[in-house]
């Protein structure tokens, strides 16, 4: 028998249908399948439809095709599943890309991706028609989520629909060997979007100390020279005295290394297609001290859009011995959502920026830059937005579709579909009308691109939250989920934990089931059941929300709780507010209380003299963390009894030092917190027969505390889980709400079915 005859006997012609689900539209999947099928001499077709990508292939090597798809998929593709069905061979010699089919969407689009190496080379190649073109893209990079109105992901459903392709781009689009084969946003200077100002003019204005508002992928940035104190000071002044840390954009990883000391994990994040802002250790003297006052870490990001590359290239030519660096902060005047519309920018940014640079490609839905850091050796979100949305979180099981409206601070929303949870981009504080409008836009857009009609709504317990009003306005059955339960449930969903899980919910404030302010809780979750199993020793909360803005108030309150309010005048001599507050505590007027770890941080920072008044949320705790050298535990610095963890001995120790060195106080405070929380969790876990400990809440953004606590728990034989797929702060609440609500809904449904059966 000849080898060719043997091969024909062993490998008969087969026809297979592949249903590919996941982030497989808008990432070059169809041209990839086309080229792969041609290389394997297979006939058939590929198309996008409402369920993902459908492929039919026929030939002698058809059985090898599914594995090749799985292992060789395009870099931006995320394959969730490949279902294979064998069909009767139909013949044919060609493999074709067919038009997309409509219908209900059960797939998703990819996130926006940073400029790839190929497009980056074309930007600087005088022989390329994309030379110097600020909107170059291909199947491996460019905007996706922020330009898409609906699925399937085709040009007609994006903001590129208003830019008909020129003859050359159209030829690239239909050429299977071209990197822009079926790249929906493909465009060139002859047919695509245009920038309102030349790159050289923008660069010259920045070099001259100007503030520039630049429209990018998900909205406008406010830019200025990161080494110019005058420009940065003016930017802060024009942003109504905003003192929050600014992010810095640089051209490449070499520039990042000049300004900071990123470790391997941080560099991997910096160069990833998502291009988030990454918090890294700053090098002294390389940047203006006005960028991140009082902090030792700086938020860096690499250029991710062609316009960024062109601008930083031009600036670098002017300073060849010094890497160009730009402050790049969100254009969100007055704390309102990010500006993304040209007309809106003309109204709202002219008082801040000396130059407003626009382009004519509409941003369908705005998205801030994502912000990340590395905690305990792995990435963690501070803000999840551009580059990651709308990638889902796998909940591990099917369930009803739930929409969650999140918290009132750092608001996000979440929609579940099947076994997936889709957390929205960062919306922000719901304390203004523009934010409420943005939240409605996000809800409508996310439900549209997912083609989902939620069956239930989940929201916070707080009776005055605007996010609760949003849920009530959806006219759906509502499942309320307590704030700290949601923090822990988010980590449970994130790490796919099951069975009883002991959670530590550590944050600034959340409305408790008893009507008091919680924020330092042990929460035990077992599917649809939960219990508050412990809390920090409550402290007085004088003047309510003012205590969160003025840490000195919490300092006085902590001394009152420790029985040494007499130390207050010594720590803050001549402070009239301290005198008044001390007198108030001496009276009979009742004061609300809080078990919040965030407020305990404020108290300690004030007692240590780090900060008495905050310019932004979390400032005192962030500056206190920045002082830590080596955490150490104070012997006898805490006690545990009846599920309550009491740090009053630690507070008393700090106060009795008079005014200790800030670094000494930070070391002792963080070290004692870590030891106390670890012991507290270990006792609680042992009492409930579990080793799983979920660590949630905004305090878990403190790298020293989170990493130290995770390490201490592992040393005690426990299995800690930190937030990874959603922020630890209130930006992750919207993931925990539907994750827990679905457990409640499915349990109630099961109970109803059981009762019907028994009847």
From Swiss-Prot:
The record places domain Acylphosphatase-like at 15-99
Q: Which InterPro entries match?
A: Acylphosphatase-like_dom (IPR001792), Acylphosphatase-like_dom_sf (IPR036046), Acylphosphatase_CS (IPR017968), Carbamoyltrans_HypF-like (IPR051060), Carbamoyltransferase_HypF (IPR004421), DHBP_synth_RibB-like_a/b_dom (IPR017945), HypF_C (IPR041440), HypF_C_2 (IPR055128)
Give the catalytic activity: C-terminal L-cysteinyl-[HypE protein] + carbamoyl phosphate + ATP + H2O = C-terminal S-carboxamide-L-cysteinyl-[HypE protein] + AMP + phosphate + diphosphate + H(+)
Keyword terms: Ligase, Metal-binding, Zinc, Zinc-finger
Specify the domain of life of the species encoding this protein.
Bacteria
Q: Which GO terms describe its molecular function?
A: carboxyl- or carbamoyltransferase activity; double-stranded RNA binding; ligase activity; zinc ion binding
Q: What is its EC number?
A: 6.2.-.-
Summary of the function given for this chain in its UniProt record: Involved in the maturation of [NiFe] hydrogenases. Along with HypE, it catalyzes the synthesis of the CN ligands of the active site iron of [NiFe]-hydrogenases. HypF functions as a carbamoyl transferase using carbamoylphosphate as a substrate and transferring the carboxamido moiety in an ATP-dependent reaction to the thiolate of the C-terminal cysteine of HypE yielding a protein-S-carboxamide.
Q: Where in the chain are the C4-type zinc fingers?
A: 116-141, 166-191
Question: YrdC-like domain spans which residues?
Answer: 196-387
Protein's GO biological process: protein maturation
Q: Which NCBIfam families match?
A: hypF (TIGR00143)
Describe which pathway this protein belongs to, using the record's wording: Protein modification; [NiFe] hydrogenase maturation
- Its name, as the record gives it, is Carbamoyltransferase HypF
Tell me which species this is from.
Rhizobium leguminosarum bv. viciae
Q: Does the keyword Ligase apply?
A: yes
UniProt xrefs under Pfam families: Acylphosphatase, HypF_C, HypF_C_2, Sua5_yciO_yrdC, zf-HYPF
Provide the family line: Belongs to the carbamoyltransferase HypF family.
What gene does this protein come from? Answer: hypF
Under the heading Gene3D superfamilies, the entry gives:
3.30.110.120, 3.30.420.360, 3.30.420.40, 3.90.870.50
